Design a protein with these regions (language model features):
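ABC ATP-binding cassette signature C-motif
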Residues: 1-201
């Protein structure tokens, strides 16, 4: 429950995120970002349980807003390990980008955010609209880089091309009417956006 509201945004939600990429889909303001922040411990629930508890996991988060500086930016700037070099190569990160984040374009800043998130090699990685502000070639770079991640990946995105290329399952936020109440439910369906949409329609 957020301050100033009497009803919880999410109530009775039960979702399991498996290894691989799960796309979180639904209308704006329905609770997608809230759910993902709960999953990685950036928000705490009023009730219910998250298992395993986020403090037992190494988590990564890439925000939607490109103005937010990655928490590990300085570490990434000084990281010349083979893993970091491969991430830089895949995403086309300039050597000087981490030292001048305020001068980067939206697409460049987004790539740098994603690079920093991947460089921490997290158990769970949440990406909120990772292809905002990018053109098609950059999207392809991002997709190629994300395919190398083998943990639990959670995508909040409206980019159908990205979801179809990456997701092995989709968590669909849907509005339902149960016992006289309008509630939000989350249904996890197998496959990418196209497959999950067909499954939901059947």
């Amino acid at each position: 429950t957020y301050p100033g509201t009497s009803e919880p945004l999410l109530d009775g939600i039960d979702v399991t995120f498996a290894r691989g990429w799960t796309a979180v889909l639904g209308d704006n303001g329905i609770g997608k970002t809230t759910l993902t922040k709960l999953a990685i411990g950036r928000l705490s629930p009023d009730a219910g349980r998250i298992s395993p508890t986020p403090n037992r996991l190494h988590t990564g988060y890439c925000p939607q807003n490109t103005d937010e500086t990655p928490e590990n930016l300085e570490d990434f700037a000084c990281d010349w390990s083979p893993q970091a070099m491969e991430i830089r190569r895949e995403l086309g990160i300039g050597d000087d980008w981490p030292w001048r984040p305020g001068t980067l374009s939206g697409g460049e800043a987004k790539r740098l955010q994603i690079a920093c998130a991947l460089a921490t090699d997290p158990d769970v990685l949440v990406l909120d609209e990772p292809t905002n502000h990018v053109d098609r070639p950059t999207r392809e770079r991002i997709i190629a880089a994300l395919r190398s991640y083998d943990g639990i990946g959670i995508l909040v995105s409206h980019d159908v091309a990205l979801i179809d290329a990456m997701a092995s399952s989709c968590a669909l936020f849907e509005r339902d009417h149960v016992r006289g109440r309008n509630i939000t439910v989350v249904r996890v369906r197998p496959g990418n956006y196209s497959a999950a949409s067909m499954d939901a329609a059947e």
